[in-house]
Amino acid sequence: MPKDANLPKVDLSLQNFPDNGCAEIGAILDKEKSSAFRSFVNEKRPVNDSIFYKSKEEFEAKGRWENYSPGRESHNFLLKPEVDLSFVEENPAFVQAMENLCGKGYQIFKKAIIRSVPSWAVPEWIDDYVKDVGRPNLNPFVYDEFQDVQYFHCTDFHQDKTRRESDFVTVYLYLDQVEADYSALRVLVGSHKMGMTTYPHALRRSMHDHDRWFYSDSTGNNMQCDQITVTGGAGSIFCFH
């Protein structure tokens, strides 16, 4: 991850994952293969206004509020036979990092493409519909054929979890160059120590330090967290819990 004088100085090496709740694995994947796969995804699952229902009326007539996101075993672009992820899953450095993190018997619980949708691509009626939603999942408003990837727009701080005792790690792979202002992942270091809390989370930004947040679990426990912005090139990997 490129160094930035404005970011907190945090050692994001894998050995510090238990304390930080996140780690930078680095640009360990083949850059050309990562970029080529990004082009393949962009061709098959583009980001533009043509993937969305054209009006609220069309959505209410044809859309749904369930089963609209990529599944573990079906309706998932990455499960298509023409998709080859061996450049990731069989990469020796990736395998070693996952074994160090999760043990030799680790399994990939779920994999999915996440696409960040810029404002210009979101139809006005949808933008108005979700403007007060902190985690605007756009998939309900996307035609069925495109719902096998995940589309988000301006996502708020949240936790990846399925249950209170969740024991998985989320692994992010960048397929192209991601700068700080290009929908980069933002993480509150150490916030995992508070455990699972409900959304929207009790967060307040410091008035003195733009990259520091005050976090509460709403039961009397409080902590301060540094925010990091995860930038990197094609083939870069970052993980968090």
Language-model-derived ranges and their functions:
Residues 3-6, 178-241:
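Double-stranded beta-helix
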Residues 22, 152-154, 166-172, 182, ...:
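Extracellular structured ligand-interaction cores
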Residues 29-31, 114-119, 162, 177-180, ...:
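Short, solvent-exposed loop/turn segments at secondary-structure junctions
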Residues 1-19, 26-157:
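Non-heme Fe(II)-dependent double-stranded beta-helix
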Residues 94, 103, 157-168, 225-226, ...:
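A short beta-loop-beta micro-motif enriched in histidine and acidic residues
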Residues 111-112, 171-173:
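A structural signal for short, well-ordered beta-strand segments
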